[in-house]
Amino acid sequence: MADHPRFGPAGVPPAFRATKASLADVPRLLREEGLDAFEYQAVRWGSKPQIKREDAGKLGLKAKENDVWLSLHGSYFINFCGDKDIVEASKQRLIACATAAEWMNAYVVVFHPGFYGKRSQTEAFRNCVEALREVVGAMGTLGIKNVKIGPETMGKPSQFGSLGEILGLCEEVEQTQPVIDWAHLHARDKGRFKMVDDFREVVAETENRLGVEAVKNMHCHFTRVEFTDKGERCHHTMDEANYGPDFAMLARVTAEFKLNPVIISESPALDVDAIKMRDTLQRELKS
């Protein structure tokens, strides 16, 4: 459980790569920027971890030394709403991600549940619950007890991942926690976050359905986003103020509810915008 709001990037920032920093260097470099979270990107993985156990352990050790919380973004090639063979392959990919998360002491594996395809929302939900229960059961067999699985709210209406669906999954399946991607919700609902109350509603619904601890320690993604009638198109930086949502509104709600979320920047300016979000919240907490 976080003792304060934490901020960090989704993946290794370009400036770090430019210096040829190793993965194990990332926590120290983030700490030097005043950031304290990092979401490792495993988005192209298959059915086996694509990181050596030794390297994952080294990342976890350096993260602990620098008080940087780790999460892991799972494979994009997961679809629990697909045909049987697709679902089976998806389960193996998610288990591989959970295995690596355990090695590096990441506390949550974020993943996209899938696309409705020809299935009804009810059938898609039932399939996701069944598959996710089997994944969590397999994790238990493997001794993976300290990693939660985090289904993410999604940015297109063709994708399984409305706020209600994600909260519903977490009500039905143990060892899960919701991942609230504010930009995805904004795009999915065609500009949902216009006022502070729009953010309050998400926080209140999450608390009502999953409890105080679930909302107090939310794992979140944030960026400004461009969208069309089909949902999310692309991410924008915090300086591109003609795109929403407005982080200042979320900062106000975070301070008001005394939340301690982990907020991962998915902006094109990964760590730069994570710092801007952190500073915005700090100003709000002091006001």
Model features per residue range: what roles?
Residues 201-212, 239-256:
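A short, acidic, amphipathic alpha-helical segment used as a generic capping/interface helix at domain edges
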Residues 18-22, 50-58, 82-93, 119-131, ...:
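Alpha-helix N-cap and loop-to-helix initiation/capping positions
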Residues 30, 38, 73, 101, ...:
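Conserved, mostly hydrophobic/aromatic
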Residues 64-65, 80-180:
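Active-site acidic/histidine proton-transfer and metal-coordination neighborhood
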Residues 2, 26-34, 50-71, 95-105, ...:
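Acidic (Asp/Glu)-rich catalytic clusters
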Residues 135-232:
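Acidic/histidine-rich catalytic cores of soluble enzymes
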Residues 1-99, 287:
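N-terminal pre-domain/capping segments
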Residues 10-15, 41-45, 75-77, 114-116, ...:
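Active-site beta-loop-alpha junctions enriched in small/polar residues
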